[in-house]
Amino acid sequence: MKLGIVGAGLIVNTLLEFIHEVDIELIAISATPAEKDKLLDLQNKHGFKYVYTDYDEMLQNNEVDTVYLGVNNHLHFTFALKALQANKHIILEKPFTSNYNQALKLVNLAKEKHLMIFEAISTIHNPNFKKIEELLPSLGDVKIVTLNYTQYSSRYDAFKKGEILPAFDYKKSGGALMDLNIYNIHFIIGLFGSPKSVDYIANIKENIDTSGILTMDYGTFKAVLIAAKDCGAPYTNCIQADEGCIYTSSPMFTLTHFEHQLNKQDPIHYDLTNNAHRMKHEFLDFLEIFNKKDYAADEKIMEHSLAVMKVITEARSKIDLVFPDDQNI
């Protein structure tokens, strides 16, 4: 895989913390002209062959076969569409797009052009998640799932003072659902598939959900997914069933450990990440699929992302949360 990276912000710097540990060649990096100094610094530190302040120019570089998009949410669809049109595979930061219709258009085009799209979401590639998936049948009939990712945002104080940064900006497809609850949604859909119905209630300020509660009805069991950027509390996550439970005090963002406990038995502790960077496992999965040209595996990943975006889009409709980017299709 020969990677071209788009962006020079926090998530790109997080990616670069571990990317040299996997067999990916860093070819190019692109951002805005205002970020030129950052780009040159990253080139010096990480050995990029090319630096661009024009995304379209980077897409013309034939040495780049895959583009990683670490840009604001509202730019995901436009940037991904251009990459596909330039015959590039894509690693697209979560959330996949602003809405389901955008996601569907990207997936259909990728299939048509025989290209791969990977959503960069750590949760479902985490070894602990895969172990939970393996242990799930031992619990019997699932009855209740509760997931809670509440984290007082470092940007919320500024937000209260009127400074609206991307994570709280509806114009940039931000909010608690898109930024935090998406990890919970990926977790539950990864284990159980799509629900029969969803509902969403939220605390709204400046046209954005600063916190909210998403309910998902699976018929035989119910799930409550909580996310908040305007308050914080200890993380509590539990799958409750008639023969046992699986629980963790780790958010789905990192899922560093969990406990598996059957009725009348002591809990068994699991921590299978080997202290690896939280994003490393997903990129190892992407690389394996890419190198094997396993389009069936990638299609499964894309279908999973579509299911997540369908839930998010329906949840937003429950609170009339509209993004300007919704018109971009």
Enumerate the language-model features and the residues they cover.
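Hydrophobic residues in well-ordered beta-strands that form the structural core
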Residues: 52, 92-93, 117-119, 248
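Beta-loop-alpha module in the N-terminal Rossmann-like domain of NAD(P)-dependent dehydrogenases
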Residues: 5, 15, 49-109
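Contiguous beta-strand/loop segments that form the cofactor/metal-binding neighborhood of enzyme cores
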Residues: 184-254, 284-292
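C-terminal helix-rich "cap/oligomerization" subdomain common to oxidoreductases
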Residues: 66-68, 285-329
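N-terminal Rossmann-like dinucleotide-binding module
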Residues: 1-46
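Rossmann-fold dehydrogenase core element
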Residues: 105-123, 141-144
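Predominantly a Rossmann-like dinucleotide-binding segment in NAD(P)-dependent oxidoreductases
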Residues: 126-195
